[in-house]
Amino acid sequence: MSVSAVELASLAAGPDAVRRLGARRGFLGETPANRELARILRDRPETFGSVHSLVLGADEVHVPDLAASRGFAPSLQVFGLECIDGFQRLRILSDALAGLGAEHLEKATVRLEIHCGRYRDVARSLHDAGHRLVNATTAQDGLIRCPNVRWLMAGDWEKEGFFDPRRGVSAGPHRRCFSMPEVTRGLACLSLAPGPEALHLATTDEGIERLWGAVGSELYLGVFRDRMSPLGVVRAVEAYDSARAALRNLPGRLKKGAGHLIDYAPDLICWKACRRLLPLEDLHVEAGSRHDWGGMIEDQLPAVTARTAEDLVRRYEAVHRARGDGPHYKGEAELLDVWREVLG
């Protein structure tokens, strides 16, 4: 059932509310989720109850005589109330009643479930284990709402393969499936942004999630620009793969000392090499491109990458010596500040 938020706001009032309602935990305060719920209630109260239900248990529920009330039950009498799930929302409603007033809360409704008898035990058991029954949302799940990504999805992929940013989507009978991580790293490597910050984030799973979660930010839009094309994505992925392969093929003697940069910060070298050779501003130009992208990526980029590696290793040697961090290269070479110093 849907209930006016103002009718529920007083349930969590008072310092003893969590004990009185038998909730699993007290009010958690300024958590990100609670701040967002409070913001929605303040700015868009009509949408507050759109997600999730408030789940209560009760010893008894008395329903008024429907005949006397012409088919409508204006109120319920609930005895032995328990908050099975939703105490944070109840407390947010209680605080909003004091801060925003009853008139504001009347704009919000809450979906309410009340369970009695054995159904109460079942509901309690399910909600106690609720975290094990829900697949956690990740930043990647929000990419489907990005207009630039949706534009890219709507492009003509028939010749190029298959692309979908969502987790758990199979490629089907397509020639090539481009995963969201490889698309992100390719586009970050060939981004028009002046620095390698986006690609540095994309080098780790945690970093790439942070990048995906920053939809609309300058860093994000430097990677996922407007009007991207399937062919541009293919070029970016192939260029990134070509540069990485060129580094793997370098002889081991070049990867000693400061040459550890090749193993510990390969994306820095790829980023710089692509800038030295490729016309990044034309990445997503499909018809009538002035450039032989295939030839540049296959025939020229490996050699440019090798020369770039030699240049950046020499620069890193000076940076490493100036930092005085001893013989350990791995942790140092992975730092964004070191990348910036090496690039000068």
What positions do the PLM features span?
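C-terminal catalytic or substrate-handling cores of phosphate/nucleotide-
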Residues: 38, 42, 106-108, 112-280
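Hydrophobic alpha-helical segments
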Residues: 47-55, 63
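Short, well-ordered loop/turn elements at secondary-structure boundaries
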Residues: 48-51, 76-79, 106-109
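Short His-Asn-centered micro-motif
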Residues: 56-57, 83-87, 115-116
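A short acidic-Thr-Gly-centered motif at the start of a beta-strand
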Residues: 67-77, 274
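Short active-site loop/helix that positions an aromatic residue
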Residues: 78-81, 87-104
